[in-house]
Structure formats: structure tokens, C-alpha cells
Amino acid sequence: MIKNICYITYQTFPASTANSLQTISNIKYFIKNKCDVSLIYPLREKSSSSSIEEIQDFYNTSIPININGVEHNYPFGKIKFFEGLMFHISHYLWAKKTVKKVEDSIYDFYITRSDWIFYFLLRKTNKRVIFECHKVSKLRKIILRFCLKKSNAKVIYLNKNLMNIFSKFNTEMNTIVLHNGVDLDDFKNSNNLNKNMDIIFIGNLQRFSKSRNIKFAIDGFVKSKLSNSFSLKIIGGPEDISNSLRDYVNENYENENIKILGQLGRIEAKNSLNKARVGVLINDNKDEHSYLHSSPLKYFEYLASNLKVVAPDFPAHKELPYSENIIFYNHDDLKSFSNALEQSLVEELKYIDLDKISLDYRIKKILEFIDK
């Protein structure tokens, strides 16, 4: 039986963020698993669009999503001061208004990553409402503690550390831990490609508007024994950050093996991943989400590309599936990072069942969870 899903989010589309890509990829596999999906989201940026052709072209997909971009006549995205406050006010008002207009009778269940949409949907409907919890905040702690008392509320936590925060309210029926996954359609021939002598970081060069400390990876690479025989490729935006990294390299190093490539298209970025040998995870331990709760999309793309993975020894990274394959380094320790890069070349990859980290597997688990 075909399930009709309403996916409501405060994300906007198209966007180059990992979160928006994850949403589109999840929807693709809901559709492949015989679901009809409607995506409702705010037109809150100049680049926002409700054109299915633009969305499909941007994400290089042909999936038949029912697109519903909703007007967003609120300050967030338009006013560039007090952005945190503007976000919360606009998010609340847009969610309340949008949920009121949703035609409840045509959907079997709802999925969201928005606290306020989760809250307002549970006040409106008796149908199941699934919340994807990727991080924690003071507001989220309050809302989830209220919402998990509802019999039709269900929560997907990104890792066990997140789930444990709400242990008093979790039951086997209303909660599950599911890490992110990867679209294996993008990496079908990774094991058969000739690999270049490349170490790669791919992703946003900032996280929550703060630096990912990419300069640390550059410095550590230069200090390693690999800097003469390997290339370090940094792929991602925003453009001003990638430009500043180019300036940093030009001012400090005469090394043609450091390549700051900026934001690439999805196909070009995937090709670079498939041909690399080592993938780097890097983050700041001062950010609670990065340190404890992250399940990075790029990690699963690295595994699907048959890369060795080098990462800081954060609790979140140790919770990742197949983390026994990760070569860990001490955070902010250049020597430890350089040693990890060198060690990655001699370590053998342990067995990885790629199907178990696929988005298809993840979506099947979500559908089983919903039917509990």
C-alpha cells in the first residue's frame, strides 16, 4: 500500500547545505520504497524556488516530488541583524501558520526536523508525526519533553548520545537511533576506479557560521611525509572562505600540492571523492553538536568511495558505524594529525557492508519504525 507522506521543514530549497541534500536524498528513497511525498518549505531566501525543474536540476535528480514552496513574509533571511532572534520568531510564526493550512486528511504521516512544526502538528492531528533530531538546544529539550508524551509522536535520534539526553521520555515504541546514510547510486563503481594520490576534505568550510579550522588540516598535511607525493584537496564554500584559504596557502607555503577548489557541482565533487585515497573529518571540539552528536554525511560518502578516514577522537565519531576503520588523531595536535595521515596509507580497511549504511536501508528502517 502506498503511503502518503508530508515532509514539512523550515529548511529552504535549493540550497548547498548538507541538511538540504539529506532531505532530498531521503525523499528519493521514500519514493523508491513506494511512498508519495509532498515537500513543504519556506521561500525565505532570494535563491528559494518552488520550481520542480530548478530543484531537480540543482540536486541532479529526476525524483517526482510534490513541491510546495510557501510564502515567508517574516524577517529571517531579510534582516541581517539579530539573526538568531529573527530565526526563532520567524520559524515559530511560519510553522504555526503553515501547519494550520495543511490538509490533514490526505496524509498518512508527517516528517519534520523543525521543533515548532513538530509541536504544532501534534496539537492538530492524531496521525503519526516523526521528528528527526540531529542536535540539542534549550528549546528542543522543552519541546521534546512535552511532545514525547503524545502517543502519536516518534523521534529519530542521530546517535545514542542524543537519545540518552531524553532517556526519561523515550520508549522502544517512540524512539530509534539511526545514523545518516549515503546514496549508493552515486558511488556504484568506486572500488573499480584508479585512485589518485589525493587526500580530500569535502563539505561546508564553516559550521554554524564558525570556522571548521581547515587551516589546521593544511598545516598538518604540510608537516607530514605525504606533502611531496600526495595532494590535499579542499572542496567546499562559501566562496569568501575558500578565497581566504587560498591566500593563506599562498602566503605561508610554496606547495603546489595544496588545492583549494571551492564549491564544485555535485557530479564533479563525487568524481573527486571516488578518485581520492583518504578522507578527512575536521571540526571544533567547542561545538557540542560536532563533539557529541554529529553523524556527518561526508563520512558515509567517504566509506562509499572506499576511502581511508582520518578524524578527531570525538565521542560522536566513535559512535559512527564502522568507526573501527577510522584513524583517529588528537584534536588540535598537528603531529598527531600528520601521523594519522601517514598511518592511513598502511592501515587495511576492515569489512564494511555498504548496504547497511545506504539511504535505502535507512528509509526501510524508518518505515518499519513508523509502523510499530
Please tell me what each predicted stretch does.
Residues 332-335, 341-372:
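A charged, aromatic-enriched C-terminal amphipathic alpha-helix characteristic of glycosyltransferases
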Residues 19-30, 217-220, 298, 366:
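Short amphipathic alpha-helix
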Residues 161, 181:
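Carbohydrate-associated surface elements
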Residues 208-212, 267-272, 279-301, 311-319:
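Nucleotide-sugar-dependent
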Residues 6-8, 156, 192-222, 232-233:
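Conserved donor-binding/catalytic core segment of Leloir-type glycosyltransferases
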Residues 9-16, 36-89, 118, 237-241:
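N-terminal strand-loop element at the rim of the active site
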Residues 236, 245-273:
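Nucleotide-activated donor-binding/catalytic signature segment of Leloir-type glycosyltransferases, i.e.
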